[in-house]
């Protein structure tokens, strides 16, 4: 006989509160990696497209996540995650072949 799952602890935060916290976290990280005028233009585009709606919040979250993922994947020089590019050290111009 099927039973309802047991209580798994406290409920998650309300969706809108969690979403706004996620957006703030993404904005803080994006400002560290992209020019502010560029991010401002992105925000203006989202506002003009979606207005002041939850769809706009979800869209900018999705775009910032994608941009940051690609940025880290390519190899951000001050990244805490992602691929760390190892520079080949050349001493006195010599290289191994």
Curated annotation (Swiss-Prot):
Gene3D superfamilies given in the database record: 6.10.210.10, VpR/VpX protein, C-terminal domain
Residues recorded as bearing Phosphoserine in the entry: 79, 95, 97
Chief location category: virion
Keywords carried by this UniProt record: Activator, AIDS, Apoptosis, Cell cycle, Host G2/M cell cycle arrest by virus, Host nucleus, Host-virus interaction, Ion channel, Ion transport, Modulation of host cell cycle by virus, Phosphoprotein, Transcription, Transcription regulation, Transport, Viral penetration into host nucleus, Virion, Virus entry into host cell
Gene Ontology biological process terms in this record: DNA-templated transcription; monoatomic ion transmembrane transport; protein homooligomerization; regulation of DNA-templated transcription; symbiont entry into host cell; symbiont-mediated activation of host apoptosis; symbiont-mediated arrest of host cell cycle during G2/M transition; viral penetration into host nucleus
Subcellular location: Virion; Host nucleus; Host extracellular space
Record GO cellular component, one term: host cell
UniProt keyword Glycoprotein present: no
One Pfam short name: VPR
PTM annotation: Phosphorylated on several residues by host. These phosphorylations regulate VPR activity for the nuclear import of the HIV-1 pre-integration complex.
Region of interest called Homooligomerization, as start-end residue ranges on this chain: 1-42
Family the entry assigns: Belongs to the HIV-1 VPR protein family.
Other remarks on this protein: HIV-1 lineages are divided in three main groups, M (for Major), O (for Outlier), and N (for New, or Non-M, Non-O). The vast majority of strains found worldwide belong to the group M. Group O seems to be endemic to and largely confined to Cameroon and neighboring countries in West Central Africa, where these viruses represent a small minority of HIV-1 strains. The group N is represented by a limited number of isolates from Cameroonian persons. The group M is further subdivided in 9 clades or subtypes (A to D, F to H, J and K).
HAMAP family reported in the protein's UniProt record: HIV_VPR
Subunit details: Homooligomer, may form homodimer. Interacts with p6-gag region of the Pr55 Gag precursor protein through a (Leu-X-X)4 motif near the C-terminus of the P6gag protein. Interacts with host UNG. May interact with host RAD23A/HHR23A. Interacts with host VPRBP/DCAF1, leading to hijack the CUL4A-RBX1-DDB1-DCAF1/VPRBP complex, mediating ubiquitination of host proteins such as TERT and ZGPAT and arrest of the cell cycle in G2 phase.
Chain's role: During virus replication, may deplete host UNG protein, and incude G2-M cell cycle arrest. Acts by targeting specific host proteins for degradation by the 26S proteasome, through association with the cellular CUL4A-DDB1 E3 ligase complex by direct interaction with host VPRPB/DCAF-1. Cell cycle arrest reportedly occurs within hours of infection and is not blocked by antiviral agents, suggesting that it is initiated by the VPR carried into the virion. Additionally, VPR induces apoptosis in a cell cycle dependent manner suggesting that these two effects are mechanistically linked. During virus entry, plays a role in the transport of the viral pre-integration (PIC) complex to the host nucleus. This function is crucial for viral infection of non-dividing macrophages. May act directly at the nuclear pore complex, by binding nucleoporins phenylalanine-glycine (FG)-repeat regions.
Record's protein name: Protein Vpr
């Amino acid at each position: 006989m099927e039973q309802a799952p047991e209580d798994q602890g406290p409920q998650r935060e309300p969706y809108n509160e969690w979403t706004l916290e996620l957006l703030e976290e993404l904005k803080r990280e994006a400002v560290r990696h992209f020019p502010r005028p560029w991010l401002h233009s992105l925000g203006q585009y989202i506002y003009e497209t979606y207005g002041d709606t939850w769809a706009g919040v979800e869209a900018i979250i999705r775009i910032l996540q994608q941009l940051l993922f690609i940025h880290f994947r390519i190899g951000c020089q001050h990244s805490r995650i992602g691929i760390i590019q190892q520079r080949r050290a050349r001493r006195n111009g010599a290289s191994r072949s």
